[in-house]
Amino acid sequence: MKTTDKIIIIDLEATCWQGDVPKGQQNEIIEIGLAVLDSQTGVITKNQGILVKPQRSTVSPFCTELTTITQDLLDKNGVSFEEAIEQLTDEYQPDLYTWVSYGQYDLNMLKKQCRSFGVPYPMGDEHINVKVWFAEKFGLQKPTGMNGALHLLNIPLEGTHHRGVDDAKNIAKILDWCLHN
């Protein structure tokens, strides 16, 4: 592991639709949820969500139902993807730390969107898939979703599921269990 004192947790939310992606649109990051876990103490030292204004898609009613994020919220409070990555880099220096996500989606989506927008990929090479690690540590036959892992650990879901800011904090709790069991 690249770092042992703190680990960055990332959970992305992206535009989505019920069924196929509409013509002329593409899945795009609309929230970068972040948490920082002190791996020794288990304390979540930072937790925030960076709202990202989509440039190549719009938030569908299905997406709002899933995430609670509206197009209006992003229009008023979102920043461009480039600004979001700059904020992430300036505030967290993520290339210096091990980072985790729950599943491979966040890693793949972040790399894909950075390539698509011509933005340097901000994360370090050390990535841990907590979904797979938790399944191995807990002795599961196959990985379970974040909600399922929290349930197995008797940890209540905090906040709103499918909000990056809240999911990052919940993933940090699962990661802490993995680190100490």
Which residues make up each language-model segment?
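Active-site catalytic pocket residues across diverse enzymes, especially alpha/beta-hydrolases
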Residues: C114-F117, C178-L179
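A structural motif
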Residues: V119, G139-H151
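Acidic two-metal-ion nuclease catalytic site recognized across multiple nuclease folds
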Residues: M1-K2, L150-L152, A168-N181
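Short hydrophobic/aromatic-enriched beta-strand-loop microsegments
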Residues: P120-I128
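Short alpha-helix plus adjacent loop in nuclease-associated cores
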Residues: I128-P143
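Active-site flanking residues adjacent to catalytic metal/cofactor-binding acidic residues
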Residues: I10, I128, D166
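Conserved non-catalytic scaffold segment of RNase H-like nuclease domains
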Residues: K2-R115, G124, N147, H151-H162
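Non-catalytic, well-ordered alpha-helical scaffold segments
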Residues: E86, L107-N108, I128-K131, K169-A172
